Amino acid sequence: MREKRKYFIAERVLLIKRSKIRELFERASKMEDVISLGIGEPDFDTPKNIKEAAKRALDEGWTHYTPNAGIPELREAVVEYYKKFYGIDIEVENVIITAGAYEGTYLAFESLLERGDEVIIPDPAFVSYAEDAKVAEAKPVRIPLREENNFLPDPNELLEKISKNTRMIVINYPNNPTGATLDKELAKTIADIAEDYNIYILSDEPYEHFIYEDAKHYPMIKFAPENTILANSFSKTFAMTGWRLGFVVAPSQVIKEMTKLHAYVIGNVASFVQIAGIEALRSEESWKAVEEMKKEYNERRKIVVKRLKNMPGIKVKEPKGAFYVFPNISGTGMSSEKFSEWLLEKARVVVIPGTAFGRMGEGYVRISYATSKEKLIEAMNRIEKALEGEK
């Protein structure tokens, strides 16, 4: 279509930066024999019982609107889930069903932040947080996550970042992109800080079931229920990224206000998808599949870490969560972006530059092991060969 006129675009949209991850994927899509270690989604298919539940729901007529906050039975299933897995008591009024954790975090930013508010966001961090803050006309304030501190926030630095304008702290553990996990003591410390300063915690927890070795997950609603907005998703846990199903757990007053915005943004999540969500949470078959996925991820994690440790110019801190490794590549003498571009051209392997997640990501790349062992081994062979050739 030939366009003759210049179109007006809202300034808040123009402020949003295009993801560097997508740019790299587009380049890779034009090349042959590329192995992608960049994708942030499970390579597994959704468990069969969940798919069958969606099919039955369609046949049973679940093709109409639902209550904006979600089908009551699914909200009840979320309540049961937190009691069963964590011993945490919440009410149905504390839950809204969303189009993935993406919408959940968006609703949190839009419902709770105003122009001039400050939101403390880790650096590096998942790409959407800073952009969501801009759309909400809030100011992102970055707090560094350092390798020497296991990619965890320093409580003293957190206190230094808090001002009279601070409205929210964002945390995400198990972490994307670093694979770090949050220990109980630090989780409680962050909760105490939020309560002392009357600040919201937006805790994004979609990788909660993919933790390894001695790591444990502690939902932030356990420590600061009155201050925490917990965003979660079926996408990673049950390999349901394309279904767009998630939820938020928060104080009932916050959920009530979020639901008003949610009603005008999407109305409700597709009804048959919500029925599948009930099956996912309540079926033992679903949880057996999750355990199988976790076992496979752990085996892949070990393969990648072991191989990277023996490569020239690479240092790696062993991650205990999610499905990412965040190796330090500064020993290669290349920047994160240069290394990622070089690796794509030289080895036909996609990794994500750490700077896609913030300034503190310089000197690192994100590697996803959410792909088959065969592809991972071949990718490691290619990376090692390319690095050996640079020595």
Swiss-Prot record:
NCBIfam families: PRK08361.1. InterPro entries: Aminotransferase_I/II_large (IPR004839), AspAT/PAT-like (IPR050596), NHTrfase_class1_PyrdxlP-BS (IPR004838), PyrdxlP-dep_Trfase (IPR015424), PyrdxlP-dep_Trfase_major (IPR015421), PyrdxlP-dep_Trfase_small (IPR015422). Homodimer. It is an enzyme of class 2 (transferase). Pfam families: Aminotran_1_2 (PF00155). GO terms for molecular function: L-aspartate:2-oxoglutarate aminotransferase activity; pyridoxal phosphate binding. Keywords: Aminotransferase, Cytoplasm, Pyridoxal phosphate, Transferase. The keyword Transferase applies. Its cofactor is pyridoxal 5'-phosphate. It is found in: Cytoplasm. Belongs to the class-I pyridoxal-phosphate-dependent aminotransferase family. CDD domains: AAT_like (cd00609). One of its GO terms (biological process) is amino acid metabolic process. Its EC number is 2.6.1.1. GO terms for cellular component: cytoplasm. This is Aspartate aminotransferase. L-aspartate binds at G40, N176, R366. It catalyses: L-aspartate + 2-oxoglutarate = oxaloacetate + L-glutamate. The modification N6-(pyridoxal phosphate)lysine is found at K236.
